[in-house]
Amino acid sequence: MSKFRLAVVQLHVSKIKADNLGRAQTLVKEAAGQGAKVVVLPECFNSPYGTGFFKEYAEKIPGESTQVLSETAKKCGIYLVGGSIPEEDGGKLYNTCSVFGPDGTLLVTHRKIHLFDIDVPGKIRFQESETLSPGKSLSMFETPYCKVGVGICYDIRFAELAQIYAKKGCQLLVYPGAFNMTTGPAHWELLQRGRAVDNQVYVATASPARDETASYVAWGHSSVINPWGEVISKAGSEESVVYADIDLQYLADVRQQIPITKQRRNDLYSVNSVQEG
């Protein structure tokens, strides 16, 4: 199958977990009704994003939120990339994405590898490492359409991760993320287009909708980028669902026209993983 429909859900996230889960279910079902075979939710879709919230909203996996994701994926018959939730395991907290198949089976969990620790003077300081621990493995899953690589937000800044995913056969990279009002306008689209062009893959990002009253204001603008680096679908700042038809024949054509995979100087350099999930 050379084409399939992808949906990205840009969800409004509140402090009420039950509301977030209910709204996520509704929008995922809406997306499936529009023919989406793969649906992506945003980072921290079940809770506010912030170091002060991670412990309060943390769950075990399996738990309440992942049970909702599993049931929704099965009911809709889709692959559901469950954004991320704060996960508690063994006394540690993680920022974790769970992916479910059309039968409701948990396919993979991706714990955010690169923690968001930044300090831009006069604009934003954020230290995920104050409360979270980093993941230690790569995360990929198979579908009948293509192989998919998973990252979370800050992971997109690290080109090596995307290169390894592409090298291992991924044709779609998904990044639930919550860039902010400083990094969003500067780097959000730039990084997505860069990862897509560098690796000649599709890239999809899912952000929470923007809430100006929140302690952490997300940029929004969830997007899908094609292997040529074009933005083929993009949300605004409000809650919405955006769709894109992923055309794997087009991907193959781009790779044939500009054959960088064959032209790489593997005798001079290489990017390899040392640990996998």
From Swiss-Prot:
Keywords: Cytoplasm, Hydrolase. It is found in: Cytoplasm. The active site is at E43, K112, C153. Pfam families: CN_hydrolase. It catalyses: 2-oxoglutaramate + H2O = 2-oxoglutarate + NH4(+); 2-oxosuccinamate + H2O = oxaloacetate + NH4(+). Its EC number is 3.5.1.3. GO terms for molecular function: 2-oxoglutaramate amidase activity; omega-amidase activity. Homodimer. Belongs to the carbon-nitrogen hydrolase superfamily. NIT1/NIT2 family. Has omega-amidase activity. The role of omega-amidase is to remove potentially toxic intermediates by converting 2-oxoglutaramate and 2-oxosuccinamate to biologically useful 2-oxoglutarate and oxaloacetate, respectively. This is Omega-amidase NIT2. The gene is nit2.
